[in-house]
Amino acid sequence: MNKILALLIVSLSLNFAAANNFLVSYEKKATFTKEELKAKWKENKIKEFITPVKYSVDVYEIIYKSRWHDGTEVLASGFYYVPVAFDGALPTMIMNHGTQLKKDFQVRLRGLQVGCIAFATDGYLSAFPHYIGLGKGEKSHLYQIAESEAYSNIDMLRAIREFNKEMGISSNHQLFLTGYSQGGHATMAAHKMIQEEYNTEFKVTASAPMSEAYDMTGVQAGVMYEKYNHQAYLPYLLLSLEKQYNFWDGDIYEVFKEPYRSII
């Protein structure tokens, strides 16, 4: 009896979309009311003339189909922030997050997710892709790999288009891209791929990549032999490049010293 009840609860909370090409499932994870957001804005001294609080915001976790570096299908995930009780068609905004080593993502009113919520409460449909290999997605994350970042954006756009149709949400086809740190790199990658390969499907209204890695080779050449604060970035990048391009002749792990090699 308990097992049947548990299955019923799961089936009610998760919505599967078998008829769609990209959207696999979605689940409402949270609602932020206007009152909560106004209080948060006041607490952090955010002026409403900068970021108006117009709507409460529902947050959905979206599971969708994307692609691995070899072209095979892979599941990816992201959060989707939807204004509550809005009228008319709304623009779409993608916010790309910075470097994250942990796979898990939780909905929270902090970090770049505040940016998504700020856009959503002002009347935008806001997407927050976790990137392939992070969140509820399959495989491991390919760090700073432009193709992987771009596909996580483009395929999530396709998934939320199917979600919008299912939920009766209207988009006005304006598309804004932004992101910070690795998210700036992902923003440029997505904009470039849309412009070069998918310009009949999507039109980017504007993009704002922020503080991205402009020159990874040049910067790493200057710091990789010195002590610096974020030692995990270089192996994260090297292992991702090896997965994507198979560039190392032999075992890539031989470049790391012990005891770090065993940990990595």
Each language-model region and where it sits:
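Sec-dependent N-terminal signal peptides
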Residues: 4-13
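Catalytic-loop region of hydrolases
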Residues: 18-87
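Short, surface-exposed "cap/lid" segments of acyl-processing enzymes
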Residues: 69-77, 81-119, 136
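A fold-wide structural signal in alpha/beta-hydrolase
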Residues: 92, 120-130
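Serine-hydrolase catalytic-loop signature spanning alpha/beta hydrolases and amidase-signature enzymes
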Residues: 100-102, 126, 159
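Alpha/beta-hydrolase active-site loop
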Residues: 143-166
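Primarily recognizes the serine-hydrolase "nucleophile elbow" in alpha/beta-hydrolase
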Residues: 159-229
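Accessory cap/linker subdomain of secreted extracellular hydrolases
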Residues: 210-264
